[in-house]
């Protein structure tokens, strides 16, 4: 049975604002949060929107990435985030938590009901293969139907994992990413996301070949913000980099304390009082 949801004016305005960010010239950086605290930190830092990271949410719940987090857990986390920040929130929807496009639509409806205004929908499977592009197109079309039903212009960010999964030669990856990106845009996606480590020339080729706003991910090969903006990249995601950085620091801290060294923790200037003041609205 289809759940009936009510979209209020505030959520509708957030959706419109988030869509405009993709339609306006110039690149914006969107950080990926894994809980309400990280989303709140990003908002206070001045970011105009935040997205979730499936990897980060999985790590925060004690799991590896790769479709380990249930839809119920995702709904819980997203509701906590949207209840704490005022900026638009986009959700890493993985493959939509279903293969049936109509079930993907209903799953998206449930996430919209807790305040989401955007979705990353990917074609990469946990076994390292790409889903058939025809199936991905049907899922995108189902989300477009939901937009019309709710009169809510939420952002569909269609992700293709040709580079992320390192499928084929360099030329084959580029051709497949461009082919899928254009097919997804034609199906109704508002933006095309091609994550993966890539150089400047690959980024330029993707901007040129994909006839839709392009989203790339921060990576160690080429991460010149000004250079990416000049190429025409519209959206730059931090991905799971920040949460992995914090996990690494926490692991080091745990090892130090286990070995009798608490200097790093005790020397922190982020006192109890400062922490409470920071998170006080």
What are the language-model segments listed below?
Residues 2-11, 18, 241-281:
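Extended, intrinsically disordered, low-complexity segments
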Residues 3-238, 245-251:
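Alpha/beta enzyme core
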């Amino acid at each position: 049975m289809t759940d009936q949801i009510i979209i209020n004016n505030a959520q509708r305005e957030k959706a419109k604002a988030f869509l405009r960010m993709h339609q306006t010239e110039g690149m914006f950086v969107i950080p990926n949060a894994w809980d309400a605290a990280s989303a709140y930190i990003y908002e206070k830092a001045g970011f105009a929107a935040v997205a979730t990271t499936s990897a980060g949410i999985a790590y925060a719940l004690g799991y590896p990435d790769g479709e380990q987090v249930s839809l119920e857990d995702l709904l819980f986390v997203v509701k906590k985030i949207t209840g704490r920040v005022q900026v638009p929130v986009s959700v890493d929807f993985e493959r939509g938590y279903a293969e049936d496009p109509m079930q993907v639509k209903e799953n998206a409806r449930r996430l919209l009901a807790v305040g989401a205004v955007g979705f990353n929908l990917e074609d990469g499977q946990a076994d390292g293969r790409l889903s058939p592009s025809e199936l991905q197109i049907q899922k995108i079309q189902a989300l477009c139907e939901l937009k019309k039903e709710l009169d809510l212009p939420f952002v569909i960010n269609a992700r293709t994992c040709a580079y992320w999964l390192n499928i084929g030669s360099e030329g084959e990856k580029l051709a497949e990413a461009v082919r899928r990106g254009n097919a997804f845009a034609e199906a109704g996606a508002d933006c095309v996301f091609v994550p993966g480590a890539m150089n400047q020339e690959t980024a330029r080729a993707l901007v040129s070949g994909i006839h839709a706003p392009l989203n790339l991910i921060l990576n160690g090969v080429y991460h010149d913000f000004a250079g990416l903006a000049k190429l025409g990249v519209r959206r730059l995601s931090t991905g799971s980099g920040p949460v992995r950085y914090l996990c690494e620091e926490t692991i080091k801290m745990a090892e130090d304390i286990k070995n009798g060294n608490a200097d790093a923790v005790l020397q922190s200037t982020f006192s109890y009082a400062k922490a409470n003041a920071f998170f006080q609205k």
